[in-house]
Design a protein with these regions (language model features):
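Conserved metal-binding segment of the jelly-roll/cupin
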Residues: 107-122
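Conserved interaction-surface patches within small, structured recognition/assembly domains
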Residues: 100-106
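Betabetaalpha-Me/HNH-type nuclease active-site subdomain
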Residues: 92, 97-100
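A short beta-strand-loop micro-motif that forms or neighbors metal/cofactor-
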Residues: 119-147
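Glycine- and acidic-residue-biased ligand/ion/polar-headgroup-sensing regions
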Residues: 72-93
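A short glycine-rich, His/Asp/Glu-containing loop-to-beta-strand
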Residues: 38-67
Length: 174
């Protein structure tokens, strides 16, 4: 079985798939008040209709990726709430799965990723905890009207490894 080693998420390597931002350690210039610092518009995205914020619980398993999904008309946000999370992504491919092109990223707790429309992905996986709690941000009912899930043939399954390899390029979070 093919192994995909996770890379710590970084702007250069993740750019083809989306964007990300630490929500607990944001960078950049804040708008400040007496008791607050506000970091506006760190991630943005368009939406037709109502946005929905949905909790997800994911149990730790063998990290064998057997399927993926994509959304043709919308991006997806995922926020790691109580653990670092492992996500896998593959490039948009016109509806034909490309598991051989999958990449894995380790996303720190408190970070939000925005996965672009048409990018292959599935639920985040817990890095350390037995159960990961995360928040999914999608237009309302996307799971029912714009979610294509494809099960891979067994020969295309891959193992997501938590052993972190170094980023292929070095870049700062933007």
């Amino acid at each position: 079985m093919r192994e995909v080693k996770a890379v710590k998420i970084n702007a250069a390597d993740f750019a083809p798939y989306g964007t990300f931002c630490s929500m607990t350690e944001p960078e950049g210039y804040p708008l400040e008040g007496e008791i607050h610092k506000f970091y506006p518009d760190r991630i943005s995205g368009t939406c037709v209709g109502t946005m929905a914020f949905s909790p997800i619980e994911v149990r730790k398993d063998e990290r064998i990726v057997k399927m993926a999904e994509y959304h043709t008309t919308t991006w997806e946000g995922i926020v790691a709430l109580d653990d670092d999370m492992l996500i896998h992504v593959a490039p948009a491919s016109g509806g034909t799965p490309v598991p051989e092109l999958a990449k894995a990223f380790l996303v720190p707790k408190g970070c939000m990723v925005k996965i672009n429309a048409a990018i292959w992905h599935l639920c985040p996986l817990p890095a350390n905890n037995e159960v990961l709690h995360a928040m999914i941000v999608l237009p309302e009912c996307t799971y029912a009207n714009d979610c294509t899930v494809v099960e891979f043939e067994e020969k295309d399954w891959f193992l997501s490894l938590i052993h972190i390899s170094e980023p292929t390029r070095h870049a700062q979070i933007s």
